[in-house]
Protein backbone atom coordinates (compact mmCIF):
# COMPACT_ATOMS: atom_id res chain seq x y z
CA UNK A 1 0.00 0.00 0.00
CA UNK A 2 2.87 2.36 0.80
CA UNK A 3 4.39 1.82 -2.65
CA UNK A 4 1.12 2.81 -4.30
CA UNK A 5 0.96 6.02 -2.26
CA UNK A 6 4.55 6.89 -3.16
CA UNK A 7 3.93 6.31 -6.88
CA UNK A 8 0.70 8.35 -6.80
CA UNK A 9 2.48 11.19 -4.99
CA UNK A 10 5.27 11.15 -7.60
CA UNK A 11 2.78 11.20 -10.46
CA UNK A 12 0.86 14.14 -8.97
CA UNK A 13 4.12 16.02 -8.47
CA UNK A 14 5.26 15.32 -12.03
CA UNK A 15 1.95 16.39 -13.55
CA UNK A 16 1.84 19.63 -11.57
CA UNK A 17 5.49 20.36 -12.38
CA UNK A 18 5.08 19.72 -16.10
CA UNK A 19 1.96 21.88 -16.35
CA UNK A 20 3.59 24.79 -14.51
CA UNK A 21 6.76 24.49 -16.58
CA UNK A 22 4.74 24.48 -19.79
CA UNK A 23 3.27 27.82 -18.83
CA UNK A 24 6.74 29.20 -18.08
CA UNK A 25 7.98 28.14 -21.52
CA UNK A 26 5.68 30.58 -23.26
CA UNK A 27 7.13 34.05 -23.49
CA UNK A 28 4.87 37.08 -23.73
CA UNK A 29 5.49 37.51 -27.47
CA UNK A 30 4.77 33.85 -28.15
CA UNK A 31 1.58 34.01 -26.11
CA UNK A 32 0.37 37.08 -27.99
CA UNK A 33 1.13 35.52 -31.35
CA UNK A 34 -0.69 32.35 -30.35
CA UNK A 35 -3.70 34.34 -29.22
CA UNK A 36 -3.74 36.52 -32.33
CA UNK A 37 -2.90 33.55 -34.57
CA UNK A 38 -0.51 35.82 -36.50
CA UNK A 39 2.06 33.25 -37.50
CA UNK A 40 1.56 29.67 -38.63
CA UNK A 41 3.03 27.06 -36.33
CA UNK A 42 6.76 26.58 -36.87
CA UNK A 43 8.33 23.17 -37.17
CA UNK A 44 9.84 21.99 -33.91
CA UNK A 45 13.45 20.90 -33.47
CA UNK A 46 13.85 17.13 -32.84
CA UNK A 47 15.86 15.62 -29.99
CA UNK A 48 19.68 15.83 -30.37
CA UNK A 49 19.43 18.52 -33.09
CA UNK A 50 20.96 21.98 -32.74
CA UNK A 51 18.80 24.70 -31.20
CA UNK A 52 21.38 27.50 -30.80
CA UNK A 53 19.38 29.94 -32.93
CA UNK A 54 15.91 28.92 -31.61
CA UNK A 55 16.12 27.99 -27.93
CA UNK A 56 12.35 27.65 -27.45
CA UNK A 57 11.67 25.52 -30.54
CA UNK A 58 12.31 22.00 -29.24
CA UNK A 59 9.71 19.28 -29.84
CA UNK A 60 7.80 17.37 -27.17
CA UNK A 61 9.07 14.03 -25.93
CA UNK A 62 7.01 11.19 -24.48
CA UNK A 63 5.99 13.13 -21.36
CA UNK A 64 7.77 16.50 -21.44
CA UNK A 65 8.93 19.09 -23.93
CA UNK A 66 12.63 18.76 -24.74
CA UNK A 67 14.80 21.58 -23.40
CA UNK A 68 17.50 23.44 -25.27
CA UNK A 69 20.69 22.57 -23.38
CA UNK A 70 23.73 24.74 -24.06
CA UNK A 71 27.43 24.27 -23.50
CA UNK A 72 30.48 26.42 -24.19
CA UNK A 73 32.93 24.94 -26.68
CA UNK A 74 36.52 26.19 -26.56
CA UNK A 75 38.48 25.86 -29.80
CA UNK A 76 42.23 25.21 -29.86
CA UNK A 77 42.88 28.90 -30.54
CA UNK A 78 40.97 29.81 -27.35
CA UNK A 79 37.81 31.08 -29.06
CA UNK A 80 34.66 30.22 -27.12
CA UNK A 81 31.36 29.50 -28.83
CA UNK A 82 28.03 28.41 -27.41
CA UNK A 83 26.48 25.26 -28.87
CA UNK A 84 23.00 24.10 -27.94
CA UNK A 85 20.98 20.96 -28.60
CA UNK A 86 17.48 19.75 -27.73
CA UNK A 87 17.55 17.08 -25.06
CA UNK A 88 15.88 15.65 -22.00
CA UNK A 89 17.01 17.24 -18.71
CA UNK A 90 18.10 14.82 -15.95
CA UNK A 91 15.04 15.45 -13.78
CA UNK A 92 12.76 14.66 -16.73
CA UNK A 93 14.72 11.45 -17.41
CA UNK A 94 14.22 10.44 -13.78
CA UNK A 95 10.50 11.17 -13.99
CA UNK A 96 10.14 9.12 -17.17
CA UNK A 97 12.05 6.26 -15.52
CA UNK A 98 9.71 6.31 -12.51
CA UNK A 99 6.61 6.40 -14.71
CA UNK A 100 7.94 3.56 -16.88
CA UNK A 101 8.75 1.51 -13.80
CA UNK A 102 5.28 2.21 -12.41
CA UNK A 103 3.68 1.07 -15.67
CA UNK A 104 5.63 -2.20 -15.55
CA UNK A 105 4.55 -2.88 -11.98
CA UNK A 106 0.92 -1.74 -12.10
CA UNK A 107 -0.02 -1.79 -15.73
UniProtKB/Swiss-Prot annotation:
Main location: secreted
Signal peptide: 1-20
Keywords: Disulfide bond, Knottin, Secreted, Signal, Toxin
Matches recorded under PROSITE patterns: SPIDER_CSTX
KW Signal (keyword) present: yes
One Pfam assignment: Toxin_35
Cysteine pairs bridged by disulfides in the record: 44-59, 51-68, 58-86, 70-84
Top-level taxon of origin: Eukaryota
Tissue specificity comment: Expressed by the venom gland.
Any single GO CC term annotated in Swiss-Prot or TrEMBL for this entry: extracellular region
Residue positions assigned to the propeptide: 21-41
One term of GO molecular function: toxin activity
Location within or outside the cell: Secreted
Family that this chain belongs to: Belongs to the neurotoxin 19 (CSTX) family. 04 (U1-Lctx) subfamily.
Domain comment quoted from the record: The presence of a 'disulfide through disulfide knot' structurally defines this protein as a knottin.
Name of the molecule in the record: U1-lycotoxin-Ls1x
Organism, scientific name: Lycosa singoriensis
Amino acid sequence: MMKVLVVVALLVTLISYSSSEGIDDLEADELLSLMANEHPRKECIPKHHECTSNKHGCCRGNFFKYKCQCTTVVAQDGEQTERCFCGTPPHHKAAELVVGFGKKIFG
